[in-house]
């Protein structure tokens, strides 16, 4: 595996491989890689002859500068993991490389980006779209891989690809969890042992809510989850919404649509964790 730091060098490598008819997969990451990222990389390696993994902590998607400073940066460990997964290139640019001048582009995909994360993290998805569109333009991959843990992000990126007419396939990949059910996240490394124990209640509550939902209404299921999280000291619910998996708009009853997802964000201490669960999938 080669580690590349500039767009020019990456494009020089890829142009040769694309000329040979090789398919290129892109896995955009912010580093601090774990088994969830590894599953995306392995899938790309399985489906494409060339896999590029970007490792870049994107400053424009952090609405909380403190979160940006605290975000773990572990490039050496990341490269070892990527090599073990069979990646062809790790693309680790500087901020100056990706943003030679400030990116003033405004992306708006209402109503997808105005709810949930969009409401609580203003500017976040604009920053995501800025960097992902830059990566798509730099790499011009045949496929790009994103995890379903960031469910709203995946929906917005699909819409961006549709509107900007990028010629590539977006591949959503299932959430990877610890053996006990906690959704893998780079932010989990910031949890104390006690916080880690509390955080487990998030996924446990979601799994229980799926059983509960089979015999209860949407509003009863919302209350079930809200009450369960409120009962755990050290957890603070930011939001839990039950939405149409395509439009991300709230649903009032289970029969409203064939694709229903519950999306949750919880503060565990000062660490913000997200997760989701599918109640119905067509």
Swiss-Prot record:
EC number(s) reported in the record? 6.3.2.1
Copy the pathway line from the protein's UniProt record.
Answer: Cofactor biosynthesis; (R)-pantothenate biosynthesis; (R)-pantothenate from (R)-pantoate and beta-alanine: step 1/1
**Any one Gene Ontology biological process term?**
pantothenate biosynthetic process
**Broad enzyme group:** ligase
Primary residence? cytoplasm
Q: Which residues form the active site?
A: 37
Keyword Cytoplasm among UniProt keywords: yes
Pfam families, per the entry: Pantoate_ligase
Cellular component per GO? cytosol
Residues passing through the membrane, by range: none
Record has Ligase as a keyword: yes
| Residues the entry annotates as binding beta-alanine | 61
UniProt GO MF annotations: ATP binding; pantoate-beta-alanine ligase activity
What superkingdom heads the lineage?
Bacteria
Say which family it is in: Belongs to the pantothenate synthetase family.
Q: Relate the protein's function as given in its record.
A: Catalyzes the condensation of pantoate with beta-alanine in an ATP-dependent reaction via a pantoyl-adenylate intermediate.
Q: Which PANTHER family match?
A: CYTIDYLATE KINASE/PANTOATE-BETA-ALANINE LIGASE (PTHR21299), PANTOATE--BETA-ALANINE LIGASE (PTHR21299:SF1)
| Further remarks about this protein from its record | The reaction proceeds by a bi uni uni bi ping pong mechanism.
Protein's name in the database: Pantothenate synthetase
Gene name of the encoded protein: panC
């Amino acid at each position: 595996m080669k580690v590349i730091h500039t767009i020019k060098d990456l494009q020089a490598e890829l142009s040769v491989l694309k000329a040979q008819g090789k398919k290129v997969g892109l896995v955009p990451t912010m580093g601090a890689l774990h088994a969830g990222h590894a599953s995306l990389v392995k899938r790309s390696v399985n489906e494409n002859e060339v896999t590029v993994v970007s490792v870049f902590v994107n400053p424009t998607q952090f609405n909380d500068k403190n979160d940006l400073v605290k975000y773990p940066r572990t490039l050496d460990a990341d490269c070892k993991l990527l090599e073990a997964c069979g990646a062809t290139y790790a693309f680790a640019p500087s901020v100056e490389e990706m943003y030679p001048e400030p990116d003033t582009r405004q992306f708006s995909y209402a109503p997808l980006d105005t709810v949930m994360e969009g409401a609580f993290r203003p500017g976040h998805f604009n920053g995501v779209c800025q960097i992902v569109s830059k990566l798509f333009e730099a790499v011009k991959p045949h496929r790009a891989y994103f995890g379903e843990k960031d469910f709203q992000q995946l929906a917005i990126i699909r819409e961006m690809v549709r509107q900007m007419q990028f010629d590539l396939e977006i591949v959503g990949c299932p959430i990877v969890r610890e053996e006990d059910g906690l959704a893998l996240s780079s932010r989990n490394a910031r949890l104390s042992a006690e916080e880690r124990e509390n955080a487990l209640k998030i996924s446990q509550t979601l799994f229980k809510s799926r059983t509960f939902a089979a015999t209860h209404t949407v509003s009863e299921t919302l209350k079930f989850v809200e009450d369960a999280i409120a009962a755990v000291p050290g957890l603070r619910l930011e939001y839990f919404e039950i939405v149409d998996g395509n439009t991300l708009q709230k649903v009032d009853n289970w029969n409203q649509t064939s694709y229903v997802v519950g999306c949750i964000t919880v503060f565990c201490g000062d660490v913000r964790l997200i997760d989701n669960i599918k109640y119905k999938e067509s």
